[in-house]
Amino acid sequence: WVKLCEKTPLVKKGADGIEIKDYKEICLTHHERLDGNSGMVLVSAAIREVDGQDKKHLMIMVPLGMALPPGLRAAVYTKDQWAKIAKNEKVDDKELKPVDLKYSLCHASGCTAEIEADAAIVDQMKAGGGLMVVAMNAAAQPIGFPVPLDGFTEAFAGKPVDNAEYKKARGQLMAQIRERQQAALEKYK
């Protein structure tokens, strides 16, 4: 988990009809899981906070190819439940409090769904072991996307990381993935 913040211009019209540019700080406490071979984002989850707004939002992105009408379902698992999942043990679903998210946007990287993240959701995430995201694929089969919550509480409460440093580290990771792809191609020539 990492916290990223940046000042973003929000343009609105004043009473006289003239556009006013107002800068708001938008922060994302964010986690993404990448495919180590392709670099494609498999799942991404974030809490979005906008300066001056009380409401926070839980945003989840899954890859393209999911059925849109059903939306997403996400549930926070306790640390004990998450440990059971890691061992492929059965978890009692009755204890879960899933939330349904509707897709709001699809783009080249995937489709994003969001919901207001009230204090109960944020508190569950702080205390939880993991967030299980379930989407339906085009064949109407449920696909699970696990998101560990290790480090969420510290990132959410902490200061944002330097955006330039994050961009540099992410660029290095993508370079490693491209090298791996190149090595695999060379192997099969």
Language-model regions: role of each:
Residues 1-189:
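A generic "folded-domain core" signal
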